Amino acid sequence: PLVKATDLHQPVDPAKLLTHVIYRNQDDFLSLLSGYADEAYQHGIFPSVMMAQAILESGSDGSSQLALESKNLFGMKGHYKGQSQEWSTFEDEGGQQYYDIQDVFRHYDSYHDSIMDYLAKLGTEDRYKQVPLAQTPQEQVHLIHEAGYATDDAYTEKLIDLMETYNLYQYN
């Protein structure tokens, strides 16, 4: 069912964070994600790419409202098993000229569901068919962006920067 939520970009109440999220800090969040490295490889996705996207879309500790309230770690739009939630989000019309829209994002029952849906999407959907063929994480993030995963012109560069900043290549 579609429900209206608050602004995706508002700060999260720390009390809500403690009651809704097991992963309360960056190390715990990275540990959660790195636990899916084998599954990422099985879908042709570099673990560093998966982790960088989760950090960019959810914050370095998974504390975005979308992650907290919808367990959506990757900013995935649309419906998941009939579940979705409407959020305010920013889109890039080109040249990093952002505008605010309301859009429907997938709602999950667990972080596991979010991660596995993300991997299935990138590993099997036709528009992402080139993504698993990438030889390097850098090539893979470029292909993900090129396939239309995000409108942000700087999406590829942001993901590469996160992989370097958090030393995510070690998980590959």
Enumerate the predicted regions with their spans.
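Catalytic cores of secreted/periplasmic lytic hydrolases that degrade extracellular macromolecules
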Residues: 1-172
